[in-house]
UniProtKB/Swiss-Prot annotation:
Entries under HAMAP family matching the protein: MraY
Keywords: Cell cycle, Cell division, Cell membrane, Cell shape, Cell wall biogenesis/degradation, Magnesium, Membrane, Metal-binding, Peptidoglycan synthesis, Transferase, Transmembrane, Transmembrane helix
Source organism (scientific name): Geobacillus sp. (strain WCH70)
Catalytic activity: UDP-N-acetyl-alpha-D-muramoyl-L-alanyl-gamma-D-glutamyl-meso-2,6-diaminopimeloyl-D-alanyl-D-alanine + di-trans,octa-cis-undecaprenyl phosphate = di-trans,octa-cis-undecaprenyl diphospho-N-acetyl-alpha-D-muramoyl-L-alanyl-D-glutamyl-meso-2,6-diaminopimeloyl-D-alanyl-D-alanine + UMP
Topology term for the membrane: Multi-pass membrane protein
Pathway stated in the Swiss-Prot or TrEMBL entry: Cell wall biogenesis; peptidoglycan biosynthesis
InterPro entries named in the record: Glycosyl_transferase_4, PNAcMuramoyl-5peptid_Trfase, PNAcMuramoyl-5peptid_Trfase_CS
Pfam name, any one: Glycos_transf_4
Protein name: Phospho-N-acetylmuramoyl-pentapeptide-transferase
Localization per record: Cell membrane
Molecular function per GO: metal ion binding; phospho-N-acetylmuramoyl-pentapeptide-transferase activity; UDP-N-acetylmuramoyl-L-alanyl-D-glutamyl-meso-2,6-diaminopimelyl-D-alanyl-D-alanine:undecaprenyl-phosphate transferase activity
EC number: 2.7.8.13
Cofactor: Mg(2+)
Amino acid sequence: MLEQVMVLAIILSFLITVILSPLFIPFLRRLKFGQSIREEGPKSHQKKTGTPTMGGIMILLSIVVTTLLMTRKFATLSVETYLLLFVTIGYGLLGFLDDFIKVVMKRNLGLTSRQKLIGQLMIAIVFYFVYQRSGFSTALHIPGTDLSINLGFGYVLLLIFMLVGGSNAVNLTDGLDGLLAGTAAIAFGAYAVLAWNQGQYDIAIFCVSVVGAVLGFLVFNAHPAKVFMGDTGSLALGGAIATVAILTKLEILLVIIGGVFVIETLSVIIQVISFKTTGKRVFRMSPLHHHYELIGWSEWRVVVTFWAVGLLFAMLGIYIEVWI
């Protein structure tokens, strides 16, 4: 029965997004919610100016509806389910505010870095206080072993870092048509397998709901994209994947399963440090996906390559936890 529920959850969330998109995209166009493309980006991206953004609203709606329907009917609406939805919606609303300022108020930078960080920290802190009341453990599991390290208060700092850092890392990856939708589907698919293996079926249902939602979105977001998810989608997905890693106690594995997000973030950090210390850039442009565009790769080639790398990372993560 539960196997059927997982399949139903993917199908339902996929269909919700696919059915909503043809209705919602023209609505975004009428409101003139078009994406602004930064001038310092690859020149090939200038033609994307005006493409409807804030499509992450459809992803969020699909995830929430599917998760609530499926967990209420076939599993339990646990504290973990509510925490997952809280963080996903919370970071989604923060992203929506950022998108709204960029698109509607015509302030290209959106929220300032400080404003965004304060919002991310507030959501992370609320998550911590609710989570710790449910009797959470401060032990950090070592993947592939029966060992764990009790971090004490250090775990609280790790938890907050994961939520803030995870949302930003995933946000950085959302720079090419279909790139984030595909890599997110792979990462959440891997965590669905691991949550199922632990018997945490409510978390597994949430994960497959995300998979279905982003795959449905990919139908319209693949190159050439008809809609972008915006920060509404990318921040929500980043917060969600970090929360899943925390609730399954597979925090370290996020570095592997979310390897593409980690690499993208490291490319930005390396680029900034190199330029500030030596005046030279390591990459043509960061995040890394733009570097490959500027050395001559087509956008589709970059995206498919990153999907493949993400799939390898996901399989490695599952192998380490399940079979070692």
